């Protein structure tokens, strides 16, 4: 039985069920620790994600859309889910399977490239505004 729940909890209702879809999770290979370069890249993605969310969430953007290399379909990730995935990657060296966003509104998601461009434009605008302010005073 795959039931690894603490004592006192009810048993897993799908224990020993050959059709249990969660059984596939047992086959997921444990991740390898990230090397230093990979770790730095994931930490940079986490920092960028915080900036992008701060700039875009209040404009109604819910997260990022990524085209999956395996299935060639768009996958929609809310800010919190993407942050959790990146943190899990840092800790475990892998990201476990997860449920996709339920009935996402595609217009509420943007790409990493869009976020980078938006952040760069926002920074350039802020710098230009600051330069203009200094010239006037």
Curated annotation (Swiss-Prot):
Protein name: Uncharacterized protein ML0386
Classification lineage: Bacteria, Bacillati, Actinomycetota, Actinomycetes, Mycobacteriales
Pfam families reported for this sequence: DUF5319 (PF17252)
Entries under InterPro entries matching the protein: DUF5319
Location of region: Disordered: 1-32
The family this protein is said to belong to: To M.tuberculosis Rv3412.
Top-rank lineage group of the source organism: Bacteria
């Amino acid at each position: 039985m795959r039931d690894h729940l603490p004592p006192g909890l009810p048993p897993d209702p799908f224990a020993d069920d050959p059709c249990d879809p969660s059984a596939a999770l047992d086959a997921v290979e444990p991740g390898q620790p990230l090397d230093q370069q990979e770790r730095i890249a994931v930490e940079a993605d986490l920092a960028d994600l915080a900036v992008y969310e701060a700039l875009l969430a209040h404009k109604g953007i819910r997260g990022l859309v990524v085209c999956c290399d395996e299935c060639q379909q768009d996958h929609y990730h809310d800010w919190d889910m993407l942050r959790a995935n990146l943190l899990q990657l840092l800790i475990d060296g892998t990201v476990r399977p997860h449920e996709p966003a339920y009935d996402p509104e595609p217009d509420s998601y943007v790409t990493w490239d869009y976020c980078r461009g938006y952040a760069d434009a926002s920074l350039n605008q802020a710098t230009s505004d600051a330069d203009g302010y200094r010239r006037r005073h």
